[in-house]
């Protein structure tokens, strides 16, 4: 019930119920594709280094990058010593998907009316997955749900109702937390290597290697089961 204290009445929300009729079956399915919007466009290492040199010279300071550095960034000839990373493009998917299915059956006889529904939702996250992982580095959410509403006409004035509902929710998250996306947005493109020549992950103090965070930080996987039952008795008191 919404708006109990309002001046214009209330809004009463009730669950769907069966009706006296032949069985009516309804199946609905949807498949959607989602893409992120308003992602920042990052400079490449060459433009970043060139503009940083220009900014330093504008305030009378010595440029940070030499002509050799600029040439290495421009040509990409030495990716380990002069990396050029596009964290957002490399680590986020362009498109992710969501599936949703819902099946309902309703009907009834003069004695019993029924409404039965089942649903399934699967929504995938936006992070890339990698072959060197022994777990899924992406995030996802799954939900399986069911509902059964039964109304029995015990007598002409007595209705006995049973409402059963349940759902299973499954969540999978990588363990990098909010630092992961912050690193993608804030780190300069030449700040670190994803992977060093010896196979170790690149990194510096006070910085998160977003590739390593996705690949090796681990994951959280949780399941939640919910079941609800409501029993009702409606007796008309006609005198």
Task: Identify the role of each PLM range.
Residues 2-234, 238:
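Membrane-proximal, glycine/serine-rich, low-complexity loop/turn segments characteristic
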């Amino acid at each position: 019930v919404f708006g109990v204290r309002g001046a214009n009445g209330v809004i009463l929300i009730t669950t769907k119920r069966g009706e006296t009729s032949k069985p009516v079956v309804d199946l609905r399915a949807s498949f959607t594709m989602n893409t992120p919007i308003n992602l920042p466009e990052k400079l490449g290492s060459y433009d970043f280094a060139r503009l940083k040199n220009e900014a330093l010279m504008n305030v009378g300071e010595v440029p940070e990058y030499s002509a050799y550095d600029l040439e290495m960034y421009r040509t990409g000839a030495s990716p380990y010593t002069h990396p050029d990373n596009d964290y957002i493009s490399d680590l986020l998917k362009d498109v992710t998907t969501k599936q949703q299915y819902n099946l309902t059956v309703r009907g009834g006889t003069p004695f019993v009316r029924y409404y039965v529904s089942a649903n399934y939702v699967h929504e995938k996250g936006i992070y890339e997955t990698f072959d060197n992982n022994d777990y899924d580095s992406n995030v996802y959410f799954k939900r399986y749900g069911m509902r059964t509403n039964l109304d029995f006409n015990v007598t002409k004035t007595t209705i006995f109702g049973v409402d059963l509902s349940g759902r299973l929710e499954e969540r999978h998250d990588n363990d990098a937390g909010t630092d992961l996306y912050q690193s993608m947005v804030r780190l300069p493109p030449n700040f670190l290597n994803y992977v060093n020549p010896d196979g170790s992950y690149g990194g510096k103090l006070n910085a998160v290697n977003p590739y390593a965070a996705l690949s090796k930080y681990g994951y959280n996987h949780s399941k939640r089961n919910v079941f609800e039952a409501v029993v009702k008795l409606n007796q008309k008191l006609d005198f």
